[in-house]
């Protein structure tokens, strides 16, 4: 099981209602269901939606920016975006929209400012060397359109009037509280728990 999923499963209490945005193959939705958590997904890939529906998972096909606007206020206890925020057209607009859907938002992403990535870029001189998905991904055709650092995301969260409840260094499974954040230079993957209360 992915480390970020382990952390998310610990964060979300039983009987919660969850929206998993960019749910991919539905693995997290399945894990949440095992914990008696009602989870629904939104996914852009029709192929992945069909796969999820074949597993009996509640997943909607479509653009998250459009679908989320149609949900009623506070329909969910938690909204989750893992490895999704850097692929949406306007992350700030999406986060503001999510405020009406849920009081808690959990967001995970790869830290683009970590030292190893910076060195890799300096040595190669190519953004293509920083892409992790597939060999066919190039800087001009990747879904990864908004690289950001931990500091960038913290600033965005505060600018949008979110409270940072906690942050996690996902790889090392270390939790940070009271506004502290993992190291921008050394943390590879981070998870933020935000609230708009």
Locations of regions flagged by a protein language model:
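Conserved alpha-helix/loop element of class I SAM-dependent methyltransferases that forms part
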Residues: 1-15
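A short SAM/SAH-binding and catalytic strip from SAM-dependent methyltransferases
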Residues: 80-90
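Short conserved loop adjoining the S-adenosyl-L-methionine
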Residues: 67-73
């Amino acid at each position: 099981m992915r480390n970020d999923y382990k952390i998310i499963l610990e964060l979300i209490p039983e009987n919660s209602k969850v929206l998993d945005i960019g749910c991919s193959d539905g693995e997290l939705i399945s894990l949440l269901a095992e914990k008696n958590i009602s989870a629904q997904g939104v996914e852009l890939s029709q192929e992945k939606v069909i796969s999820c529906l074949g597993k009996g998972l509640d997943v909607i096909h479509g653009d998250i920016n459009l679908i989320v606007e149609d949900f009623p206020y506070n329909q969910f206890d938690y909204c989750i975006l893992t490895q999704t925020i850097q692929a949406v057209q306007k992350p700030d607009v999406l986060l503001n929209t999510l405020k009406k859907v849920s009081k808690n938002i959990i967001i995970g992403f790869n830290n683009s400012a970590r030292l190893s990535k910076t060195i890799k870029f300096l040595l190669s001189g190519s953004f293509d060397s920083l892409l992790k998905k597939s060999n066919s991904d190039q800087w001009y055709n990747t879904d990864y359109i908004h690289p950001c650092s931990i500091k960038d995301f913290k600033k965005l969260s505060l600018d949008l009037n979110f409270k940072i409840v906690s942050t996690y260094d996902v790889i090392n499974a270390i939790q940070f509280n009271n506004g502290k954040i993992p190291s921008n230079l050394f943390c590879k993957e981070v998870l933020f728990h935000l609230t708009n209360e």
